[in-house]
A protein has these predicted regions:
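Acidic, surface-exposed loops and disordered segments
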Residues: 1-178
């Protein structure tokens, strides 16, 4: 799939079925994560898979996620950056996107979760690590609503179809809005 189509059809899953990952699927996820860490270089990055979603959720609820709204999922993958080099974080983020693509092929949904404001000790308790810093967290699980994952893409509408001046009979042009 080319980048344009990837961006058009990629979805984020915020609601997951309340069931643990099947053992065979969990093994495949571990292999995907392990392969990506190997490819990117373990000296700078680690991907931590935690299939005890309940414990991660309890540890991070109220402090992680957009404005502290944590996404509840059966599993989480954390990007553990082993240094503060911005290139490491960028490389890791690309690695997470590769992982997301492979997880979607397994029928799993994913959602990025903000952890930048979470205290390091809290993150260490959630993922049991001692080296580096978790910069990115990914919720992983079976989507609650498969239909939403298969949504159809609609091209961006023209300004004239969405914005009006004074009344609904007077569409605004791009020039009007400048």
């Amino acid at each position: 799939m080319d980048t344009k189509n990837l961006l058009k059809f990629r979805t984020s899953t915020r609601d997951y079925k309340d069931e643990k990952l099947d053992e065979a699927i969990a093994k495949k996820v571990y292999e995907i994560v392990n392969d990506e860490a190997e490819k990117l270089g373990r000296e700078n990055l680690a991907f931590l898979l935690n299939t005890d979603g309940e414990s991660v959720y309890k540890a991070l609820n109220g402090v992680a996620g957009y404005r502290g709204v944590m996404i509840k999922a059966p599993a989480y993958i954390a990007l553990d950056a082993r240094n503060n080099d911005p290139a490491t974080i960028v490389k890791g983020a690309y690695g997470v996107e590769e992982i997301i693509t492979k997880l979607h092929k397994l029928g799993l949904g994913t959602c990025w979760i903000t952890v930048s404001e979470v205290d390091e000790v809290v993150k260490q308790n959630a993922f049991n690590y001692s080296e580096g810093d978790i910069n990115i967290l990914l919720a992983v699980g079976y989507p609650l609503d498969d239909e939403r994952r298969e949504h159809s893409y609609i091209d961006r509408g023209a300004t004239e179809d969405l914005v009006f001046l004074g009344d609904f009979d007077t569409p605004a042009t791009d020039e009007d809005l400048e």
